Design a protein with these regions (language model features):
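Pre-Walker A (Motif I) flank of P-loop NTPase domains
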Residues: 1-5, 106
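ATP-dependent small-molecule kinase phosphotransfer cores
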Residues: 40-107
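Small-molecule kinase domains that catalyze NTP-dependent phosphoryl transfer to phosphate-bearing small molecules
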Residues: 57-65, 70, 148-191
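RNA pseudouridine synthases
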Residues: 102, 108, 114-121, 142
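Conserved phosphate-donor/acceptor-positioning beta-strand/loop module used by diverse small-molecule
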Residues: 121-159
Length: 209
């Protein structure tokens, strides 16, 4: 049995919900939005600021000079000086450390945040990419956005952002199938997809080819 699972997902694919089901079925820790709070606590910044930098590159917040000081640091990460500011790179560095620590503890499901890249050479980690038909993704996204929003452009933009985030911070191609043990369509149903992933983890080889 693998000791950790990473789930990368297209926006609106239901990958987060599938990850949640798996964590409940296995009794494992789910690291998704909770990572944002852990980063904020480690950096001693407002969780809302950490949320805005989650899975993104430096945005308009950085360009207009948002100056939120990083006043704390995780053990093993050098503390910053008064001249340093919390930004996307800081967010990613702290997230990477939290992912590595979670892997050491084991029994965790890591959603997004480049987990498949951070842990790609660990033989005891199972990597999954969740995708969905375009129509399903649009339907899910429509339920999250305000009326009148350009849903299709929002989803495309989100895909571009995640692709660029993984490329810039981890040097990986987010959509490269070679990063994953399994690609799963949520069209199968979230419960079925979760069960298939767990079964593959339990039956599959412990070492990656």
């Amino acid at each position: 049995m693998f000791r950790a699972l990473t789930i990368a997902r297209e926006y609106g694919s239901g990958g987060g919900s599938i990850a949640n089901r798996i964590s409940q079925m296995l009794g494992w820790t789910l690291l998704d939005k909770a990572l944002i709070l852990e980063v904020a606590r480690a950096a001693n910044v407002d969780p809302e600021l950490a949320r805005r930098y989650d899975e993104c590159i430096d945005s308009w917040l950085h360009r207009v000079g948002r100056r939120a000081l990083w006043r704390g640091a995780l053990e093993g990460v050098a503390a910053v000086t008064e001249a340093d500011f919390f930004d996307a790179e800081t967010m990613t560095a702290l997230t990477r450390d939290l992912i590595l620590q979670a892997h050491e503890r084991g029994k965790c499901v890591i959603v997004g945040r480049g987990g498949q890249c951070v842990l790609q050479h660990r033989a005891d980690v199972f990597h999954v990419f969740v995708y969905a038909p375009w129509s399903d993704r649009i339907q899910r996204a429509r339920g999250r956005l305000p009326a009148g929003a350009d849903v299709e452009e929002f989803v495309r933009s989100n895909d571009r952002q995640r692709t660029e985030y993984v490329r810039l911070h981890f040097g990986c191609n987010w959509s490269d199938p070679h990063l994953y043990h399994m690609l799963v369509s949520s069209e199968l149903g979230e419960e079925t997809a979760a069960s298939i992933i767990i079964d593959a983890m339990e039956r599959g080889p412990k070492d990656r080819a």
